[in-house]
Amino acid sequence: WSSDCALPIFAAGVPIDSVAHIEKMVPVRSDLFSPTPDYLLRVQGESMIDIGIFDGDLLAVRKSDHAKHGDIVVARLNGEVTVKRLDRSQKTLRLLAENIDFDPIVITPDAEFFIEGHAVGVIRTAL
């Protein structure tokens, strides 16, 4: 049995690096995910439903400023936080939804684009 760790929950769209934007802290078993996440992000929207990430879910995120092709990432694009699949397969960098109703997002050279972290799991709860 592993001990609990307390993780902050952030709402999508707020600065993830700001303590002022923490919804609340919740205990999470430290062996629930590997690697251990740094925070939970409350998902908003339906862009990732085809891989089982639904509106209101808590996405367990490991902080990282880089990710590899195919990773599910939390990215900041022009000030907006989004959860998408990173596509590095073409000459352009793209963020792909996992819902056919959403178009790919092409990252242009002038865009403010940062990887905030990558998904390590999902919690479906009423927290």
Language-model features, listed with the residues they occupy:
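Short, Lys/Arg- and Gly-enriched loop/turn segments at beta-strand edges
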Residues: 67-74, 82-83
